[in-house]
UniProtKB/Swiss-Prot annotation:
It is found in: Cell membrane; Forespore inner membrane; Forespore outer membrane; Membrane raft. Induction: Transcribed during vegetative growth, drops off after entry into stationary phase and the onset of sporulation. Transcription rises again 70-80 minutes after germination. Belongs to the transpeptidase family. Its EC number is 3.4.16.4. This is Penicillin-binding protein 3. The active site is at S410. One of its GO terms (molecular function) is serine-type D-Ala-D-Ala carboxypeptidase activity. It is a single-pass membrane protein. Gene3D superfamilies: DD-peptidase/beta-lactamase superfamily, NTF2-like, domain 1, Penicillin-binding protein 2a (Domain 2), Penicillin-binding protein 2a, domain 3.
Length: 668
């Protein structure tokens, strides 16, 4: 029993001795742990290792928020901190040690690296001692000693501008008026001025008051309220006549031709927080603009340029790191703004699209969609009335139509003829015997038949089939080829593949699945069925008829050479192209032709009309119609126009389109 008591006392004394002599972490161990936390940017944990004096100077919350924000704003990546050994001069110093360390990191402004020295102090708490870091801001950047601060600034590049073929600006950077208030100059007329100015600028009084109540605003501050378009000088004059209201000039994106080029140029707006998160760090800042639609979006990377960054000490101007901004590149288009405006003026009151090409080179002279919108509204703001009207419009003015697909109607007939000629199943001068207005292949079609407009002609060759737009002739042409041959031929014209173009174009399709029945094959041969084409593709598909049978590759970006790039070679023979042009001349110049009226003197146009009936069945009385006309100047060979207008039922069908399209050749 006595032995047990002695042993117990010995163990207790030993345990007390161990506790009393517990080893304090060495300065090197403390620094190593701190460096690990630093490399992981664990500022919460780092704070625990700071000296008492540092903790008196800055709270944990402020420490974490400040240094976390600096690293985030600087875009710090690949942070690497390494510590050395305790300075030899400190060997005999029991309460203070100096340890050198190296820091390297990648930032938005470039690589930063430096050497510094950490001071560690031995401090006592209630029951223990520990080595703590005597932190100061120079740990983050060496230049931040002596109460200096750091500034991280993004430098926006100049956005590239968009020009037409003749150097006319379609999307430009320019100085525009910005209207604002100097609060101290309002005097006793503050309420009256705010009320009047709100009406003139289409703002609410609350909008203005909130801006005037911002924390930074002083009596002599200029408080910006609204940018206005350069052509609104009258508004600027009226607004600045009010007491305390003045203007300044600011750089802004501007679209000089507004709604006429809206779907082509698209627009930019301020980047959202959500969009910023998805972008590569450092490529955009929270003050950046971003292309949202049209070419502004398609060529965002080229137009945008590269954001510059600067990390510096504002008190001294000393630069810690800097990356210069790289301005965006300009876009020079093949678009001719005069042609663009003429086409838009014809379409602006309708819903539709138009494309103009130089058919020998494939250069796009115009891309028009209607109804449209003014892209400047996204820069300078919309009135509530304008915004509501645009969003309620069932014809969707924000969506381009020249790159969407629609049933082409009878405009497909020349293409179908070309495929037949190429494959030897159709001879231009060979006459088909067609009797009556209706026809079906055999009794397997049941009650279904193909109908033509007139039964006058019973012996029909290609020229007359095109002039009279004979559905039966072209249905038989498709059946003579067969589904496989017709499908292969359509693919040589670019169906079922992406159009090689500098603007996104919806892929044209032959059928929902395939031409799996004779009825569908026949209907497709004259432009009904399930076929879908974009106006841009349809215009391109007529280029083989203008010259030598090659399908020209369309282009939107201006290049040094004006020679054409070929998309598909010899989709029709040169002789076949001439035969088709002969028939298409008759469509316009023969009084039997669907594009004969109205007669326009002085033009030499070959073309084809088309009316696509959008019905659920033949008996559908409420179906709508899209009217088409595709035509080209067969003498000068310098202009090809494809135009589509929706809802032409009760307006003359495709004849409504012909009149508008012919004007383009008259004025060219």
């Amino acid at each position: 029993m006595l032995k047990k008591c002695i042993l117990l006392v010995f163990l207790c004394v030993g345990l007390i001795g161990l506790i009393g002599c517990s080893k304090t972490d060495s300065p090197e161990d403390r620094m190593e742990a701190f460096v690990k936390q630093w490399n992981d940017q664990q500022f919460d944990d780092m704070y625990q290792s700071l000296t008492k004096d540092v903790k008196k100077e800055i709270s944990k919350k402020d420490f974490v928020n400040r240094y976390k924000a600096i690293y985030e704003q600087a875009g710090v990546k690949n942070l690497k901190v390494t510590a050395g050994e305790v300075d030899k001069d400190d060997q005999d110093n029991k309460t203070m040690k100096h340890i050198p360390y190296k820091v390297s990191m990648n930032t938005n402004a470039g690589k930063v690296s430096f050497k510094n020295t950490a001071v560690l102090k031995l401090e006592k708490t209630d029951d223990e001692e520990s080595w703590n870091i005597d932190w100061d801001p120079s740990f983050i950047f060496k230049q931040l000693a002596d109460d200096k601060t750091v500034q991280i600034m993004s430098i926006e590049p100049k956005r590239g501008q968009i020009y037409d073929k003749n150097g006319k600006g379609l999307a430009v950077n320019t100085d525009v008026p910005e209207i604002g208030i100097v609060p101290g100059e309002l005097g006793d007329k503050k309420e009256k001025v705010i009320k009047e100015l709100a009406k003139k600028l289409d703002l609410t009084e609350d909008d203005i008051k909130k801006k005037l109540d911002q924390g930074w605003v002083k009596d002599d501050s200029f408080v910006p309220l609204k940018k206005v378009k350069p052509d609104q000088e009258k508004l600027v004059s009226e607004a600045t006549s009010l007491q305390g209201v003045t203007r300044t000039n600011v750089s802004s994106r501007y679209y000089p031709y507004g709604e006429k080029t809206a779907h082509l140029t698209g627009y930019v707006r301020a980047i959202t927080a959500e969009e910023l998160k998805k972008k590569k760090e450092g490529t955009y800042s929270d003050t950046s603009n971003i292309g949202i639609a049209g070419l502004e979006n398609v060529y965002e990377d080229k137009l945008r340029g590269t954001t510059g960054w600067k990390i510096y000490v504002p008190q001294t101007g000393e630069v810690i790191a800097e990356k210069k901004a790289k301005d965006g590149e300009d876009l020079h288009l093949t678009i001719d703004i005069k042609t663009q405006m003429k086409l838009y003026d014809e379409l602006k009151d309708d819903s539709g699209a138009a494309v103009a090409l130089q058919p020998k080179t494939g250069e796009t002279l115009a891309l028009v969609s209607a109804p449209s919108y003014d892209p400047n509204g996204f820069i300078f703001g919309w009135s509530d009335k304008e915004w509501k009207k645009l969003n309620k419009d069932k014809n969707n003015p924000f969506s381009a139509k020249f790159n969407k697909t629609y049933a082409p109607g009878s405009t497909i007939k020349p293409i179908a003829a070309a495929i037949g000629i190429k494959n030897g199943t159709l001879k231009a001068d060979e006459k088909k015997t067609i009797k009556g207005k209706e026809w079906q292949k055999d009794s397997s079609w049941g009650g279904y038949s193909v109908t033509r407009v007139s039964e006058r002609l019973q012996q029909v060759d290609l020229e007359n089939a095109l002039i009279t737009s004979d559905n039966i002739y072209f249905a038989q042409n498709a059946l003579d080829m067969g589904a496989d041959t017709f499908t292969k031929g359509l693919k040589t014209f670019g169906f079922s593949e992406d159009v090689p173009y500098e603007f996104p174009i919806q892929k044209s399709s032959i059928a929902n699945d395939k031409l799996d029945s004779d009825i569908l094959l026949a209907d497709t041969g004259y432009g009904q069925g399930q076929m879908q084409m974009s106006p841009l593709h349809l215009a391109t598909a007529y280029t083989p008829f203008v010259d030598n049978g090659d399908l020209v590759k369309p282009t939107l970006i201006k290049k040094d050479s004006q020679t054409a790039d070929v998309w598909h070679k010899q989709v029709v023979t040169k002789e076949g192209a001439a035969d088709i042009t002969k028939g298409l001349k008759g469509v316009v110049e023969d009084e039997r032709g669907s594009a004969y009226q109205p007669v326009v003197k002085g033009i030499t146009v070959a073309g084809k009309t088309g009316t696509a009936e959008l019905k659920t069945s033949k008996d559908d009385k409420d179906g709508t119609e899209n009217g088409w006309f595709v035509g080209y100047d067969y003498e000068n060979k310098d202009l090809l126009v494809a135009m589509m207008i929706q809802n032409v039922q009760d307006r003359g069908g495709s004849h409504y389109v012909v009149e508008k399209a012919k004007k383009q050749f008259q004025s060219n």
